[in-house]
Amino acid sequence: MSCPVIELTQQLIRRPSLSPDDAGCQALMIERLRAIGFTVERMDFGDTQNFWAWRGQGETLAFAGHTDVVPAGDADRWINPPFEPTIRDGMLFGRGAADMKGSLAAMVVAAERFVAQHPNHKNRLAFLITSDEEASAKNGTVRVVETLMERHERLDYCLVGEPSSTEVVGDVVKNGRRGSLTCNLTIHGVQGHVAYPHLADNPVHRAAPMLNELVNIEWDKGNEFFPPTSMQIANLQAGTGSNNVIPGDFSVQFNFRFSTELTDEMIKSRVVALLEKYELRYSVDWWLSGQPFLTQRGKLVDAVVNAIAHYNEIKPQLLTTGGTSDGRFIARMGAQVVELGPVNATIHKINECVNAADLQLLARMYQRIMEQLVA
């Protein structure tokens, strides 16, 4: 299939960029962007490669994404080697095809076509690309955003190429994301022999009533834009592995995906109050992965909806469901942020794939968004 979007996607897939290793993907993108007049600034931090590229000046539309991918898993279970892109029955297979090398290729080709038609565009077009989104995400987009904010860089609109679609490209646009807060809690007891419980203090038994109340809390009812806040226990750990030892400590890890009805401080206060209510001895460590954000109808959402309607003749759902993305960092700059990308049915799975025609369509949509906001 001779198509610049498909060809570039295949070139990117061939580079096994397991997070945070970029494996040469960004060099490929940078070469293409410099060729059409972009200024490129590398912003590497630690083991992570990032770049910020721009063309023009004024009101700024940035396209954001990541070159890293998750591990392929058992390569023998793939219909073809995961880093050897193959097209079968119109589907392009390979790790990263949907998440998100197809989007990156569509962005670059859209920019090439846009610049060819609008060499003197009135506003600024930019790219923010990282190699660490799938892993720790500590030296990636968040560090670039901090640098841009320190020098008061302008960012008005940002389109993140995450695979937002569910059945056909453009059927879902993410115009916000829930916040993510993780609690690492340890309940302290006294270790002892199970035959002499009066000489010990079992932290699992102590914690059980508190955990029962915790999992039954209705945190909020959500709102027009967000589903209700969710709390899920992710990991439990206690004991020595022996059946005759009462554990001394009991570790519980739980995560909140929270709406704009709550703040992280409100959640923390309620959890601590619960621990105090049950008179537990504990230590606690919190990790805030991201605050909730929302982009309401405005120039960016309107441009995205227009592009989808023009090329796919559908009206997208505007949703805030799903996991976190780097959009949570970019929103700190005050930018309108949305996510539009290919169908996400196979992301992170064996035999990850994307409809090749969808990537061609996505490039056209991206180009039309550029035309509405940058030309």
UniProtKB/Swiss-Prot annotation:
Catalytic activity: N-succinyl-(2S,6S)-2,6-diaminopimelate + H2O = (2S,6S)-2,6-diaminopimelate + succinate
Gene3D superfamilies membership: Zn peptidases
UniProt cofactor note: Binds 2 Zn(2+) or Co(2+) ions per subunit.
Alphabetical list of CDD domains matching this protein: M20_DapE_proteobac (cd03891)
Cofactor(s) the record lists: Zn(2+); Co(2+)
Example GO molecular function: succinyl-diaminopimelate desuccinylase activity
Enzyme Commission number, as recorded: 3.5.1.18
Active-site residues annotated for this sequence: D68, E133
InterPro entries hit by this protein: ArgE/DapE_CS, Bact_exopeptidase_dim_dom, DapE_proteobac, Peptidase_M20, Peptidase_M20_dimer, Peptidase_M20A
Gene Ontology biological-process entries: diaminopimelate biosynthetic process; L-arginine biosynthetic process; lysine biosynthetic process via diaminopimelate
Pathway per the UniProt entry: Amino-acid biosynthesis; L-lysine biosynthesis via DAP pathway; LL-2,6-diaminopimelate from (S)-tetrahydrodipicolinate (succinylase route): step 3/3
Binding site for Zn(2+) 2: D99, E134, H348
Alphabetically ordered keywords of this record: Amino-acid biosynthesis, Cobalt, Diaminopimelate biosynthesis, Hydrolase, Lysine biosynthesis, Metal-binding, Zinc
Binding site residues for Zn(2+) 1: H66, D99, E162
Pfam families for the chain: M20_dimer, Peptidase_M20
Family stated for the protein in its record: Belongs to the peptidase M20A family. DapE subfamily.
Assembly and oligomerization: Homodimer.
Name this protein carries in UniProt: Succinyl-diaminopimelate desuccinylase
The organism's taxonomic lineage, starting at the top: Bacteria, Pseudomonadati, Pseudomonadota, Gammaproteobacteria, Enterobacterales
Gene: dapE
